[in-house]
Amino acid sequence: MLSPRRTKFRKQQRGRMGGLAHRGSTLNFGDFALQAQEPAWITSRQIEASRRAMTRYIRRGGKIWIRIFPDKPVTMRPAETRMGSGKGNPEFWVAVVKPGRILFEIAGVTEEIAREAMRLAAYKLPIKTKFIVRSQVVEEQE
């Protein structure tokens, strides 16, 4: 599972998820992509489950790029702990995803295979997603 090797601070504030993704919202590497339509925290476990689902489906052919990285620690208190006595310990890592963000990209496979692989990956994620094709993106920009 993905997590940072080291961070400057162990704990982070939760923050807000307003607005759209401007960075990471264009197809850069592959021919097909999965784009987020809702804001959410996506855990490293969900990213790994999606990656496994895609790699199992496309087998040897093709290449997959993961365009998000879980760099935010989420802390939790132990069960049945009284209020106070500080912030809990980091339990897992999440990637902050805003609408428009490209989550995964695939190249080297047909559109049907890519579409099905992305569908399997999308099942593992807690958000609505959209399948994007490079040729359609180029046509819209012209």
Swiss-Prot record:
Keyword tags: Ribonucleoprotein, Ribosomal protein, RNA-binding, rRNA-binding, tRNA-binding
The keyword Ribosomal protein appears for this protein: yes
Pfam families named in the record: Ribosomal_L16 (PF00252)
GO cellular component: cytosolic large ribosomal subunit
Alphabetical list of Gene3D superfamilies matching this protein: Ribosomal protein L10e/L16
Signal peptide, first to last residue: none
Function: Binds 23S rRNA and is also seen to make contacts with the A and possibly P site tRNAs.
Protein known as: Large ribosomal subunit protein uL16
Organism: Nostoc sp. (strain PCC 7120 / SAG 25.82 / UTEX 2576)
Listed GO MF terms: rRNA binding; structural constituent of ribosome; tRNA binding
Keyword rRNA processing set for record: no
Record-stated family: Belongs to the universal ribosomal protein uL16 family.
Subunit structure: Part of the 50S ribosomal subunit.
Encoding gene (name): rplP
Source taxon at top rank: Bacteria
Matching CDD domains: Ribosomal_L16_L10e
GO terms classed as biological process: translation
Coiled-coil annotated spans: none
